[in-house]
């Protein structure tokens, strides 16, 4: 592929296209990948379809102002995002340790973007072009649109609109708002006059003319009073609906952050149009010498079938970004994309995924949503399935069957996550059977997250007995179809509500599983989630009940160690945790014990004289039998963070 297959990135590209001045320039923290899994590509191609010229400045050197000037000054403004992931999540682990890799950067190396990329980029653009409008969007801007708790600062920060000095913020999926805003700019409207576009947030000095709005506790209140913070979050949480949601206002000193109601969901026709745009479907050739962009490997042969999720897991901020209403593509659109993939020279016959935030949520949760929107204080699948919930996998199954029949397609995997509770609600086992028979490769990844009902309730997840029933059914089906396939559970430590007692309960469950899971991670308090509000305030904002929060680093390390109690390096922490919790009965050689009385010696490999730092012990734990199951799935914590359902 040549540069002409991509949006322009240089003055040479502009010259070849006879462009003197670009209409918009996108500045992004990710490398430039022209694929519909990347927001920069979608927004760029949508604007191109509308007749605008768009250039890309990917991962500029924030210490060099000239990098922000290399495409000149745009006619209408700059569009700024941090990339597909919040830059702080991208840079730091849950324990605040610096990451050394970045799948969205050349060669998978870190260091190509700054911390708090949106703020840094906006400041540099203002320095380069003082009067050029700046519109911010993407996950970092979207989830920080109000005053928010910032885990890395361990304090409440102002709206990112205040800190970045941007002119307008587009939150959520931005296709509709960016088209409306760009057309208003084309018609001659000034950026500071654009105040009525849904899905946007702006700063206002005077709100006397504003109508039908809710004012939430101010920045000054939420930064000093945790009850006020919880109250502000609850109102935000309840109003994220395009039909019933109201305008929200939050005072910041003498100014106001104003969030217009969310944009309406894209129709099926609109979704089809977005995914049919002329993407190059790979990274820009300028990265080839550096080893390419690793993130493309996971998505190049994956298909987005829908957006949105009504699962409402407390630790997921999707409600604030994609929303609870499912927006799906037509089968024809998806089949065209699958057929196109089979003609790509590096296609090997495997489609890696057909799904979305939750693979088996292919349609709206109920008919009520179409007229009245999502329920304000009621969830679709938690704590139990709503009576109006439509439980049906038939359409999704028919889609998968059609893709399987496409010539040159050997296998169609589902990797984006299955909601096992929704699967269990379906009395028709046809989808479950074909899932096991055709769409997994030896193992299915699921996200029970915990097994303590107290913790699960705060997570917004189904009770333990639902997961237990699912596990039994999964193995029963595999036995019937003569397949020896495993489950790989995602598990989380230190979530609000999880004390040592709950962590030990989970460790005992893992003991009965018979192997040590690799897919575990500490709770990560990221912006925008219900769980993050619990973490900061110690309050469940929806019930106003107090919540125990494990914040002490020693206890957090203990909880994580308990989830991998059979790893020798965790022995001391596990023993200390068991003694602290008065569970010495779990120390010893009995069948229910987690660890032996005495710490075993590490075995060393005499051949190369290197110690094996991942030794396992405890003959009563049948880990070795299934060790390959977890070993195959060892991934960096960033990808685990993305894939939880």
UniProtKB/Swiss-Prot annotation:
The keyword Transcription regulation does not apply. Pfam families: DUF3362, Radical_SAM, Radical_SAM_N. Its cofactor is [4Fe-4S] cluster. Residues 610-624 have a biased composition (Low complexity). [4Fe-4S] cluster binds at residues 309, 313, 316. Residues 295-566 form the Radical SAM core domain. The keyword Iron applies. Keywords: 4Fe-4S, Iron, Iron-sulfur, Metal-binding, S-adenosyl-L-methionine. It comes from the Bacteria. Residues 600-609, 632-645 have a biased composition (Basic residues). One of its GO terms (molecular function) is catalytic activity. Binds 1 [4Fe-4S] cluster. The cluster is coordinated with 3 cysteines and an exchangeable S-adenosyl-L-methionine. Residues 598-645 are annotated as: Disordered. Belongs to the UPF0313 family. This is UPF0313 protein CLK_3381. It comes from Clostridium botulinum (strain Loch Maree / Type A3). The lineage of its organism: Bacteria, Bacillati, Bacillota, Clostridia, Eubacteriales.
